[in-house]
């Protein structure tokens, strides 16, 4: 009767109940007064809106002071969250966590222990406590137990309740019974329907959307890199982040069904390459951080091998080239080797074949001219050659990315880079004044063309890729001494590939580079040939014999065979082809031939000839063609291939 009387007084006071409840519902969920144990009247008066204050002022002796009306208004206001979602209050943000909430797990095995309970929720986040108690619903059965797991967030407890409810055998096949799941508000001891949140996630009829549907979860799991985690509406809650205020209803609706990548389709492959494993529970903020800072998986930091080489002393260069592992590791870890199998990344320099010589920078960049100018010669032009098919079809490329020339720089050094996977070797050589054609003829300052040592196997031959770069040097302490020489040495070691059947040495002594640097150039312009496995022996005395030469070269490592013949000429004795004895020596590999050239250049034959000692001994140079190969095209085809034809005879 008092309730009806109070409603009559309320109608007489000309205050609409809907207006009072609507305004009060806007303030009640935003306050935390309901979370503290306090009297109902005090709690309600603290959070009541101005509409009820007006009621008190209009009728101080009426229903406002009655506890029944106060409790009625309080109950009606706090219970609006259980509406059908169509009233005015359903649009208000009233789903504020006033927990904690308890997840109850019943129908358990008889021998369950607390340790097993912790194992079940070991991967769950936001767990406050886990208890194993006797079930109060079965007071006469002491064996019935219940697992009570306390969560601080409604989104977390409903999320894990749905997961457990979807499992038919939580405890394995030995206990093939479905466990019963309940969610209870610890303060009010009222059950919470966690399945309601699942259905509302698909109908979008109520703002209580803490959980996406199961089909949406499967789609998100299949697209782990497109996962969206936003506040309480996440399918994989994140503990403290779930207690933050939810976004607005419009943004929530737009995000709830947005399963595509919000950061762009082009970043999917980057995230898959940079992050090997990404959990579904990653937040949107963390995912954006991952996409903006990609790191190549499994790739070590690359080092600048060319710069580290030029920063060394001269003695250290020899050690690094022949015996050092650092340069080998640098080349092995370089992105150039990876670019042969996959598209180049942004850090890989792009070849510009028609660019100027100073604009092309190789993969192994060199230091500036200010670094150790007195110890090492500053770089000016350098390039790296690759096995590109269109280069082979253009034999007259000028100013290409292969070798750049500059008449103002007198001396060059060509180094073939060591490959870590194939354990290749290289020898430093000094040449001068490089023209820009593919004949690679290097001329000295006095106008005599000299021998060249290009990286021919990677330019002209459709074989395996070899790496090299051209380094120019100008050492002020040795310029005068170098100008006195008629020309400079011609030698270069070519890499031995794993996929070839050529037997080659894997280690070269440290003194080989120093020996090669002291080798004078061939005096005859016809001796300027690219490196191959066959050496031409020049400046032989007229009475030289095959036995002497065989005795001299047979002790060299990698020696294969020797071809000797006498070809006398009426022009007298000279220092080149067609005069006196002719000898060609074939080795198993270019590296063996290069080593023999460095060690035996200028040597005397076993039988001394005093009249010829002042001529400097024998002069070695690379043969135009490998032994047994003839033809004008062999220079561009077979002369650069150390796995194609030098085994023939």
From Swiss-Prot:
RRM domain mapped to chain residues: 533-625
Inducing factors: Cell cycle-regulated. Expression peaks during S/G2 phase.
InterPro entries linked to this entry: Nucleotide-bd_a/b_plait_sf, RBD_domain_sf, RRM_dom
MF annotations from Gene Ontology: mRNA binding
Protein name as annotated: Protein WHI4
Domain of life: Eukaryota
One Pfam family it belongs to: RRM_1
Cell compartments where the protein resides: Cytoplasm
Biological source species: Saccharomyces cerevisiae (strain ATCC 204508 / S288c)
Chain intervals with Polar residues compositional bias: 228-238, 631-649
Post-translation changes: Phosphorylated by PKA in vitro.
Keyword Phosphoprotein set for record: yes
Record keyword Cytoplasm present: yes
Region described as Disordered: 196-217, 228-247, 438-461, 604-649
Function text: Has a partially redundant function to WHI3, a dosage-dependent modulator of cell size.
UniProt modified residues of type Phosphoserine: 22, 206, 258, 283
GO biological process entries: mRNA destabilization; regulation of cell size
Database matches in CDD domains: RRM_scw1_like
Record key words, sorted: Cytoplasm, Phosphoprotein, RNA-binding
Major localization listed first in the record, in broad terms: cytoplasm
GO cellular component, one term: cytoplasm
């Amino acid at each position: 009767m008092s309730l009806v009387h109070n409603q009559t007084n309320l109608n007489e006071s000309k205050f609409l109940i809907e207006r009072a409840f609507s305004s009060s519902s806007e303030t009640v969920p935003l306050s935390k007064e309901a979370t503290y144990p306090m009297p109902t009247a005090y709690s309600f008066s603290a959070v009541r809106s101005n509409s009820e204050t007006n009621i008190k002022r209009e009728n101080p002796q009426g229903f406002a002071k009655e506890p029944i009306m106060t409790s009625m208004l309080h109950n009606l206001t706090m219970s609006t969250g259980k509406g059908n979602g169509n009233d005015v209050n359903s649009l208000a943000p009233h789903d504020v966590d006033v927990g904690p909430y308890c997840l109850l797990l019943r129908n358990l095995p008889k021998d369950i222990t607390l340790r097993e309970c912790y194992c079940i929720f070991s991967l769950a986040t936001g767990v406050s406590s886990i208890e194993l108690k006797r079930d109060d619903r079965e007071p006469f059965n002491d064996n019935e137990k219940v697992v009570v797991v306390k969560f601080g967030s409604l989104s977390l407890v409903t999320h894990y309740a749905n997961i457990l409810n979807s499992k038919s055998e939580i405890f394995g096949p030995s206990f093939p019974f479905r466990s019963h799941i309940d969610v209870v508000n610890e303060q009010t001891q009222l059950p919470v329907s966690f399945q309601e949140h699942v259905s509302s996630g698909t109908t979008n009829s109520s703002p209580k959307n803490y959980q996406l549907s199961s089909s949406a979860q499967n789609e998100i799991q299949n697209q782990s890199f497109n996962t969206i985690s936003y506040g309480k509406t996440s399918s994989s809650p994140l503990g403290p982040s779930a207690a933050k205020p939810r976004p607005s209803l419009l943004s929530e609706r737009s995000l709830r069904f947005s399963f595509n990548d919000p950061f762009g389709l082009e970043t999917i492959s980057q995230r898959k390459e940079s992050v090997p494993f990404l959990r579904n529970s990653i937040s949107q903020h963390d995912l954006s951080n991952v996409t903006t800072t990609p790191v190549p998986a499994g790739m070590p930091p690359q080092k600048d091998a060319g710069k580290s080489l030029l920063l060394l002393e001269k003695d250290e260069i020899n050690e690094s080239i022949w015996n050092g592992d650092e340069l080998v590791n640098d080349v092995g870890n370089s992105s150039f080797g990876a670019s042969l199998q996959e598209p180049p990344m942004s850090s890989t320099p792009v070849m510009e074949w028609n660019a100027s010589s100073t604009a092309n920078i190789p993969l192994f960049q060199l230091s500036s001219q200010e670094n150790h100018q007195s110890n090492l010669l500053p770089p000016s032009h350098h390039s790296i050659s690759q096995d590109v098919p269109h280069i082979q079809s253009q034999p007259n490329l000028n100013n290409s990315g292969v070798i750049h020339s500059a008449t103002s720089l007198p001396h060059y050094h060509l180094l073939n880079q060591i490959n870590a996977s194939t354990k290749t070797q290289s020898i430093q050589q000094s040449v001068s004044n490089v023209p820009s054609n593919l004949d690679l003829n290097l001329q000295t300052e006095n106008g005599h063309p000299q021998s060249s040592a290009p990286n021919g196997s990677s330019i002209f031959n459709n074989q395996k890729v070899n790496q090299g770069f051209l380094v120019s040097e100008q050492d002020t302490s040795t310029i005068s001494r170098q100008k006195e020489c008629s020309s400079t040495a011609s030698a270069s070691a070519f890499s031995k590939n794993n996929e070839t059947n050529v037997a080659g040495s894997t280690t070269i002594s440290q003194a080989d580079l120093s020996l090669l640097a002291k080798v004078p150039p061939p005096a005859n312009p016809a001796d300027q040939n690219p490196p191959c496995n066959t050496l031409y022996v020049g400046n032989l005395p007229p009475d030289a014999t095959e036995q002497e030469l065989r005795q001299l070269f047979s002790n060299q490592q990698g020696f294969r065979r020797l071809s000797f013949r006498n070809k006398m000429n009426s022009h007298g004795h000279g220092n080149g082809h067609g005069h006196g004895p002719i000898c060609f020596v074939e080795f198993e590999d270019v590296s063996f031939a290069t080593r023999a050239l460095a060690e035996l250049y200028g040597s005397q034959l076993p039988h001394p000839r005093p009249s010829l000692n002042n001529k400097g001994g024998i002069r070695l140079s690379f043969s135009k063609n490998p032994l047994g190969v003839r033809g004008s095209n062999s220079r561009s085809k077979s002369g650069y291939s150390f796995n194609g034809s030098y085994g023939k005879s």
